[in-house]
Amino acid sequence: MNTLLDCFCGMGGVSDGFALEGFDVTGIDIVDAQVKLDYKHKFIQADMLMLKGEDFRGYDVIWGSPPCTDFSTASCPNKTRKGRKAPDPERGLELIRAFRKFVDDANPKFWLMENVPRTTKFYTMEKPILSFWIGKYAKRVLWGNVAFPLISEFRFSQVLEKDYQKFKWRKQSALKAKIPLACSRAFARACKQALEVK
């Protein structure tokens, strides 16, 4: 069975999609009450800054979705709510660098990292392999070593818009953190194809 390590797994949007495509999934996150309630797979509570990739060798795919709040325009200072930290790209880059070092040390067959487009203004060490929309309003960027043609075969705009509408985004703000299943399943299929080729 193919294996996925989902770093910064949150409530499991990516994990769920990969599991539905037959992957054995393990998630890692610092954790809060919402994650504990919603995450349905094997789980490791940990800070990515403290983990060593060497301890996680053997996974076929490692996925990372570092928090986007330090790069997102939705977190601009003029929109900052009381008690919420203002965006700090350097803080966000620390997590991205830690994830990339973790991946290099863990040496999976494939890795993918997802974040908001504005991240590319600050993280310039690698070029993204894909940018895509989740519905009409949320754009994302993907880095990794899965062959671009395998990913681009999927028609994200059609699949994602349908999936996006299923969520009650305004009523349950926590769902905003979830990557729609159609999206994560498409990436899981691309990874499965890549693993068959490798």
PLM-predicted stretches and their roles:
Residues 4-52:
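SAM cofactor-binding core of SAM-dependent methyltransferases
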Residues 1:
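Phosphate-coordination loops involved in phosphoryl transfer and adenosine-cofactor binding
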